[in-house]
Amino acid sequence: MTTDPSVKLKSAKDSLVSSLFELSKAANQTASSIVDFYNAIGDDEEEKIEAFTTLTESLQTLTSGVNHLHGISSELVNPIDDDKDAIIAAPVKAVRRKIERDPNAPKKPLTVFFAYSAYVRQELREDRQKAGLPPLSSTEITQEISKKWKELSDNEKEKWKQAYNVELENYQREKSKYLEAKKNGTLPPASLENGPTHAPVPIPFSLQHAAEPPVEKRPHDDDGSSEKKKKKKKKDKKKDKSNSSI
């Protein structure tokens, strides 16, 4: 086995390049598989939840591996001058121009499952905060949302679907108004303050208007009413006396 440092360095470099190539190839295959898997799911919400849960866990594993790779690469010394010339510069990708969205344009409401997820996520956060418990991780939240959605009855799920349909109809009306105003040139100046900042979250009416606790009467209100009754009785007695004297 050779002990020449330059040979060992070249061998290590070749191994690293080969590993990175395999990693890139695997990432491309994973992305393609995700698209195929998502397209094969269809409209089954429960299967989508399972898919998102699996995807979240896989991405966290991948992120951990990439961070580990980054830590190792940052510790490597710079290559010697002879090897610098052998490194092939990676092609510079053209920067995609970000399409600017008109702030005045209405935002499409979140779909049924994402609206439910947003509602439950906020509910979990508030409940744990009130109980003095630490916040859940992203994976734990996703699993809890999946569990709660599966436990919902068909009737409850239908309420979420109805809420989405209401918001969707409202969005379509607002979109028609927006397109008409844009066509006529009557849109207000583009400003984040004028337009919607977040996509509407369709929530069932029953959850929007939960029963509020009855307002307790203040003690002085009762005292005041009883005091008025006493005064009225005194007046009635005076009237009776005056009538009897006549």
Swiss-Prot record:
DNA-binding region, residues: 106-179
Biased composition (Basic residues): 228-238
Membrane-spanning intervals of the chain: none
GO terms, molecular function: DNA binding, bending; double-stranded DNA binding; four-way junction DNA binding
Keyword flag ATP-binding: no
Keywords assigned: DNA-binding, Nucleus, Transcription, Transcription regulation
Compositionally biased intervals (Basic and acidic residues): 214-227
UniProt KW Isomerase keyword: no
Any single biological process term in GO: rDNA chromatin condensation
Segments for region (Disordered): 179-246
Pfam families, per the entry: HMG_box
Any one GO CC term of the record: cytosol
Disulfide bridges in this chain: none
Subcellular localization: Nucleus, Nucleolus
Function: DNA-binding protein that is probably part of the rDNA transcription apparatus. Acts synergetically with the RPA49 subunit of RNA polymerase I during rDNA transcription. May participate in mutagenesis control.
Miscellaneous remark of the record: Present with 19000 molecules/cell in log phase SD medium.
The protein's assembly and partners: Interacts with FPR1. Interacts with an unidentified DNA helicase. Associates with rDNA.
Protein name in the entry: High mobility group protein 1
Organism of this sequence: Saccharomyces cerevisiae (strain ATCC 204508 / S288c) (Baker's yeast)
